[in-house]
C-alpha cells in the first residue's frame, strides 16, 4: 500500500477514518467527521449545490496530522459573512469572483477551529498550503470564517485581512433556574419576557426536549416541515434536507436536541440545536401556527432553560438579530479572514474593512448601553 505523506486535497471524508479526523477536531460536534460527512452525503454541501469539497490534509506515514475543511464555492449563499458587494464590484470591472475557496463549516455561523492540528507548525503548513492551492487553482480569493482566537494571529501574519462581525450569545452566570436568570434583568425586560411566555402558555402550548436518540422519524419529519416553512416564508430555498438530519440522528444523537411545542397533543413548533461540551448551539426553527411569543419561547427561552438545567456555560443563538439583546443574549465579536488574489481589490477591501471595523466597534458600544441586565459587569467580549 502506498504511504500517504505531505499535503493532499481530498474530495470526500469517506477516505479518512472518522477517528483520525475527530482526534484533530476535538470536542467540536459541528466540525466532526459525522457532521461534515452528512452534509456531503446528503447532497446539501456538494458540487451540485455549489459546495465542492476539497479538504486540505497533511499526512505523515499515512497518519492524518492536520486538516482544513475547505470548499470550492460558486456562490456566497450559506456563509453568514456577506461578500456579495465584493462579487458585484468584481463583475462591474469585468473580473470573475467565483469560484472562490471557503474554509468554514457549511451553513454554520459558529466559531471553532479552522486549522485542525496539534501544533503551530502544522497549522502554519496548512495555511501556507491553502494559499498555494488558491494561487495554483486561480481562484479569486480564500475566506476563513469564524476561526478561534488563537488562529486569528496566524491568518493575519500570513497576510489575510481580518473582518469583524457581531453575534448574540447567552452566558450562564450560575443561574439556579429561569426565574433566577430573570431576576438579574431590569424590570422592563423581565416584565416583557414574562408576558411573552404567558401568552404561549395561555395558547395551550407545552414543550418537550428530545435528545437525538429519543426523536422518532415522525419528529424529524415534522421538524423539517417547519424548517422548510421558515425558509419559504422568507422566499428562500432551504439549505438542508431530511436525509441530512436523519444521518445526524444516527451518527451523533448525543449531540442533538430537538425542542418540540405541542398544542392539544399535536406538534405545532420545533427548534433544532446542537449540544457541545459546554455550549448549546441554536440552529433552526419553524412553526405550523402563529402564536404571539412562540418564536422567542421555542428558540431562546426553552434553550436557556435547557442550559440552566444541564449546567451548560452558554447558548449561541445564531447570526444577527438585535431582538436577542432584550432576551438576555449579549453582543459577541466574531472574526473572519480574507485573502484576495487581485492586489488592487485587496487594497480597496482593506480600506473598506478599516471603516467597517470602526462602525462595528461603535455598534457594540451602542448595544452595550442597552444591556437588559441590572449589573454593569456584562461587557461584550
How should each PLM-predicted stretch be described?
Residues 1-381:
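N-acyltransferase acceptor-side catalytic subdomain
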Amino acid at each position: 500500500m502506498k504511504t500517504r505523506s505531505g499535503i493532499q486535497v481530498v474530495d470526500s471524508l469517506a477516505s479518512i477514518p472518522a477517528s483520525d479526523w475527530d482526534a484533530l477536531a476535538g470536542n467540536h460536534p459541528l466540525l466532526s467527521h459525522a457532521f461534515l460527512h452528512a452534509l456531503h452525503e446528503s447532497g446539501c454541501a456538494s458540487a451540485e449545490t455549489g459546495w465542492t469539497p476539497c479538504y486540505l490534509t497533511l499526512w505523515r506515514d499515512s497518519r492524518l496530522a492536520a486538516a482544513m475543511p475547505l470548499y470550492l464555492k460558486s456562490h456566497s449563499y450559506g456563509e453568514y459573512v456577506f461578500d456579495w458587494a465584493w462579487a458585484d464590484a468584481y463583475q462591474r470591472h469585468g473580473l470573475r469572483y467565483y469560484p472562490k475557496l471557503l474554509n468554514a463549516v457549511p451553513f454554520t455561523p459558529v466559531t471553532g477551529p479552522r486549522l485542525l492540528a496539534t501544533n503551530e507548525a502544522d497549522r502554519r503548513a496548512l495555511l501556507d498550503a491553502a494559499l498555494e492551492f488558491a494561487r495554483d487553482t486561480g481562484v479569486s480569493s480564500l475566506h476563513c470564517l469564524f476561526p478561534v482566537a488563537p488562529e486569528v494571529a496566524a491568518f493575519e501574519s500570513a497576510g489575510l485581512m481580518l473582518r469583524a462581525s457581531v453575534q448574540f450569545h447567552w452566558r450562564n452566570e450560575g443561574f439556579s433556574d429561569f426565574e433566577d436568570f430573570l431576576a438579574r434583568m431590569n424590570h422592563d425586560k423581565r416584565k416583557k419576557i414574562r408576558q411573552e411566555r404567558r401568552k404561549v402558555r395561555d395558547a395551550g402550548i407545552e414543550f418537550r426536549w428530545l435528545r437525538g436518540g429519543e426523536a422518532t422519524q415522525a419528529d424529524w419529519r415534522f421538524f423539517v416541515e417547519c424548517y422548510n416553512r421558515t425558509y419559504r416564508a422568507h422566499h428562500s430555498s432551504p439549505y438542508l434536507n431530511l436525509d441530512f438530519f436523519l444521518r445526524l440522528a444516527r451518527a451523533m444523537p448525543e449531540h442533538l436536541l430537538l425542542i418540540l411545542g405541542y398544542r392539544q397533543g399535536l406538534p405545532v413548533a420545533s427548534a433544532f440545536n446542537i449540544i457541545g461540551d459546554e455550549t448549546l448551539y441554536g440552529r433552526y426553527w419553524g412553526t405550523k401556527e402563529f402564536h404571539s411569543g412562540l418564536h422567542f419561547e421555542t428558540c431562546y427561552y426553552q434553550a436557556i432553560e435547557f442550559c440552566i438545567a444541564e449546567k451548560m456555560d452558554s447558548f449561541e443563538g445564531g447570526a444577527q438579530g438585535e431582538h436577542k439583546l432584550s432576551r438576555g443574549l449579549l453582543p459577541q465579536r466574531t472574526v473572519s479572514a480574507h485573502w484576495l488574489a487581485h492586489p488592487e481589490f485587496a487594497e480597496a477591501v482593506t480600506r473598506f474593512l478599516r471603516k467597517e471595523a470602526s462602525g462595528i466597534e461603535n455598534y457594540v458600544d451602542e448595544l452595550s448601553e442597552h444591556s437588559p441586565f441590572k449589573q454593569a459587569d456584562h461587557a461584550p467580549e
